[in-house]
Amino acid sequence: MKLLRFGPPGQEKPGALDAQGRVRDLSAVVDDIGGNVLLPASVAKLRALDLAALPLVAGEPQKSLRLGPCVARTGKLICIGLNYSDHAAEAGMQVPPEPVVFNKWTSAIVGPDDNVEIPRGSVKTDWEVELGVVIGQGGRYIAEADAMPHVAGYCIVNDVSEREFQIERSGTWDKGKGCDTFGPMGPWLVTADEVPDPQALRMWLDVDGKRFQSGSTATMVYKVPFLISYLSRFMSLQSGDVISTGTPPGVGMGQKPPVFLRAGQTMHLGIDGLGTQTQLAVQA
């Protein structure tokens, strides 16, 4: 099932994509797509719905109908750095002995096709297509063997990054990762039953039609079950939390010479089975 949120920013309503690619309104069924709605029992009830019996929403999704972030009220957007060995190499860094964990502030989250703002003073804004893992059943100290039932579904995250803020200006990575609009999410949450193997998904990203990133989740260093277990040692995972699992090679700072995003350029990215995103870069 593909769960989504449609409408103007801040006024999104819950919806689902039907078999014909049209949006059906779930407002009479749930208040939004997030929190307890993502618990396993709640998702099972949504999957059992006859979507054809629900109101049809006018407009074509991602064209005449805006989609918002696919998860509402995200409590935590937890990111994993250097989780593809070939990306670590292009960044000139070693594969870490444990996952590199950082945060994206939830104020960075926007819809899949909303504009991305290049921050004032930025000279090194970059792109990163990533697989997002949406937590359904929360927990602490989750065993790796028990991790997958905690997943509600998957989505695309563009982990937009400002490399000077992130790397060159001391402190943690967070200030180069959490700028407003740096977390496009969606277009929809694909429930876990429709993604039999999250480690076998092709992913890509283009800038102005040029392919920069092309990879597969198969080359992750730390796989989804391990990441869930690992993170749960340090924090409670809660329904609606999102784990952004790292990016394959092809980011701007890894080019020779490096290239970075400029206002007026367009990013187009996707992951097999999870849809696509398109963002115009604008100056903040």
Regions found by a protein language model. Give the residues of each.
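Short catalytic-site patches enriched in acidic/histidine residues
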Residues: 100-119, 139-140, 181-190, 248-252
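N-terminal non-catalytic cap/leader segment that marks the start of a structured domain
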Residues: 1-99, 268
